[in-house]
């Protein structure tokens, strides 16, 4: 909306059609003529006030069992994991995660990638590292010395393909992107380990003794 108002201002000032204006880097450019003016210069003295109200559509009613669908937007994602496994020591290195994900509309590509990589790191932790060990009601690994978290050294190479399917009922068509990787990265990694070792893995995280014993 701000961009449209700014285009209208520039078009009125220079006698142009606002539909032929685009933003390139930090400039407003006339696609049909020579005009190129910085956004900061074009916005000097311009006051734009815009109020926008968005309300999510209502979620479904609960059924007779007290259950219902609380989601207002759905995102779809696929993951493929590549792992190196030392079958004698039971050690696993997640080498690469390839993923394609429905992101709605990408509003900030760099932040989007950060969300994807963060979700992948969480899923990796659940797959091969993070576990609270309890014995007789006592947590045996109460510190980060014993409770292992993924670090930058554990992070795999990520191949990410965003699929933009804007949600027509969400602000700017955006969807949540950090949560889906947390869900499907874990089974992708476990499936890759199972394929590499032939071991029928039935729990997470996958421990060395699950592989080599």
Where are the regions that the model predicts?
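C-terminal catalytic domains of large/alpha subunits in multi-subunit enzymes
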Residues: 1-213
């Amino acid at each position: 909306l701000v961009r449209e108002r700014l285009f209208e201002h520039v078009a009125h000032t220079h006698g142009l059609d606002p539909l032929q204006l685009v933003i390139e880097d930090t400039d407003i450019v006339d696609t049909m003529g020579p005009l190129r003016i910085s956004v900061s210069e074009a916005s000097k003295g311009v006051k734009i006030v815009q109020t926008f109200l968005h309300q999510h559509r209502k979620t479904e009613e609960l059924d007779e069992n007290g259950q219902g669908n609380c989601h207002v937007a759905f995102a779809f994602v696929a993951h493929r994991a590549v792992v190196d496994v030392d079958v004698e020591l039971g050690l696993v290195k997640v080498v690469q995660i390839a993923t394609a994900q429905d992101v709605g509309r990408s509003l900030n590509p760099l932040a989007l990638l950060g969300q994807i990589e963060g979700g992948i790191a969480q899923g990796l932790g659940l797959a091969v590292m993070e576990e609270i060990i309890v014995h007789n009601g006592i947590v045996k690994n109460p510190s980060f010395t014993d409770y292992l978290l993924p670090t930058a050294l554990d992070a795999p190479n990520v191949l990410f393909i965003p699929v933009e399917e804007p949600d027509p009922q969400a602000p700017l068509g955006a969807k949540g992107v950090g949560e889906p990787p947390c869900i499907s990265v874990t089974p992708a990694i476990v499936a890759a380990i199972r394929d590499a070792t032939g071991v029928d893995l039935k729990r997470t995280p996958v421990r060395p003794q699950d592989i080599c014993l």
